[in-house]
Amino acid sequence: MNRLPAIFLAMGLVRCAGADNPDDARWDFRFGRPALDGGALAAVWHDGELFVGGAFQGAGANFAPGVARWDGTNWWPVGEGLSATNAIGWTVTSLAVWEHELYAGGNFVRSGDDWLPGLARWNGTNWSALPGIAAARVRRLLVQNGSLFAAGNLQLAGDTNYYGVARWNGNVWETYDSRIGRTEGIGCIAVRGETVYVSGDFNVIADTAIPYNAYWNGATWQLLPGLTNQTFRTLAIHAGGLYGSGSFTHIGGIAANNLARWDGESWWPVGDGFDQAPDRLLSTPSGLYAVGSLKQSGSTTINNVARWNGSAWQSLGADTWPAAENPNELCLADDGRLFAVGYFFSVQGQRAGHAAEWTGTQWKPLVVNNSLALTDGFLSIFSIAADKDSLFVGGVYSEPAGASGRAVWQLKSNVWAKLGGDFTNIGGAPVIASLVVQNGQLFAGGAFTNVNHATIHHLARWDGDQWQPVGNITNGPIGAMVSDGTNLFIGESPAGFQVNGRTVKRWDGHQWSTLADQVNNGITALAWAEGDLYAGGGFTRIGTLAANRIAVWKNGQWETLGGGMDGAAGVTVQAIVVDGTNVFAGGRFATAGGVAVNNLARWDGAQWHPVGSPPTDGVWAPATAIMALTIRDGNLYVGGFFTGAGGQNIPALARFDGTNWTRLGSGLRGWEVATPVPRVRTMAWQENALWVGGLFPAAGNKSAVSLARWVAHPAMRLSVPESMENEAWRIRASGVTGLRFVVESSTDLQEWTECTRGQGDTDPWEFQDASSSSPRFYRTVLCP
């Protein structure tokens, strides 16, 4: 038997190359969508990889706002990406490669903290603004005649005019005197020789009344004839002719279905055209391609993408995209491969994310294989529970294909399963407010009256096959639940539900008993500790006890905790956690026991205190404030709908170590267009990892669709079998689930060399080091 000639060292957490925040290594990489999480509008081939731009923030496992690259296996960010403001619905609309560098145009305004007004250059390391541009909304970039053309609405530095076209030669901008209105813009451009063709929503260009379509003849702007009171969808030069698509059946007096060719004097049809206007035309040495919502060309069925063979249009593939989804941009790689991007969630019936490659016979989605994103559509998580083997989540979903509802799912052995059918509610929107695992049984509570077509009022138990009612109980909507390991406690009716006689009840597995009736407002938080039950909500009376929003059930009766919480309208306690003699309460309130606090307070058994010092530290919120609390190893984790903690910009999720407030890595992010501030509604621990649920697209530098996993204490370990394999040791890393890492080796513990990179798709993870036949040391290094 061979003896092990190596010593294995424990995991070390250090900053990997390019890591802005090394703690982002603790965020699980598996909960992003398999490709892009939003539509793609642009694509270009650069340095052997596909670059895609659009209105997305996640690409595979990574946070990648606006622009991402595909290396053939994985999606990656491009620097800090390109971001818009929360009032803009699209980000990157065009990409081009000029002079060996990547250029992006769109409606973005920044990359990270750097201001970039709509036009940017990527040098392989950083995004930067182009000289001379004061502001820009770029719709199309085009490389022609050794120059870069930008079309849209651009303003040059020191110039008050707005231009529809600008040409960059590397030193200066030439505008062709393309002055247009401030709110107008050019949507497409084509260049042939010195002639520049444009189309857009303008009525005057260079002080000349020319509506929608024009061309620059080298000296002046002229009307491009053919269309009246409408624009072209796209323009392209192919085989010496100008091709234009739009919504027309006639152009320049000739019949043409949504596509025509201009020879400099007249318009001509291009075969039978299409039933819809192509979104983009791509000229290649092998022919002209068209892409869009294309279904017919004369009697020929078209599958969204077609190639012109000189006499007719031929479809690329069949039955590829669902009816309401389609690609809208094409890209040709240097090696002849064709890519399509757009707005589509499936390809050939396979899960996709807005990007695909033509294999020569069919379209193939460009996806990573390790995605555990629950849906490719909308997802908002309201409740989480976990046991040793499974994660349970309850929330609202909307699939791209149209299905939507409220449901509970189980994640076990890296496979999601929907538990039963949807939850519905007569008279209002259903809510799955709380999940609890007790003695191997899963309970779901909230506002619902029906589960999978069976009548169940607000509380259900999963029996392994279907949802069942719990005992003979008539209760109102449930706002909170907790278990002491034997008994299940429920608090009725969150604020907003009109239910008389809200109660706190206990289920012992056989029968119900009431701990409090006539609670005058909703219960939204319950916590159990050391034989005591804590309740929080919007109430001012619980049973016969006057109590402001928080109380404790102790020795068979309710007691107050000081003077409770007060503040402006909507005062409520929504989360409680107990740590020894300290009780932490979070929600929406200004004072606790008369002490000034910001939505978060600590009860020491005698009086209330702010969390942090001074009291203005607290947690600042625009609306709902704190919705979830948990404690581990002396750290208080706070989740909710807030923008800052401890005077710092820390949105939605914060950690307090007793002295300082910090983010978890670089923190959670919001959707810039729809929900700029992320929201956390629920948290739960599973061994050494914290699960976070709510409404957000990313956690740290990872894409994470409303569900994220933070590994608080990575427990990575290296080991080897007892024998060699092919004269080399096979090295095993365990405790790596959801983590990226580097394995390094050394012969002297001074100089370390990277052996390989890995990621925890499987646990344990193994690799073979051909150099391991000689003595050496190994270590693993976490990498964001």
Task: Please give the residue ranges for each predicted region.
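Short, composition-biased motifs enriched in small/polar/acidic residues
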Residues: H713-P784
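Extracytoplasmic surface signature
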Residues: R3-A715
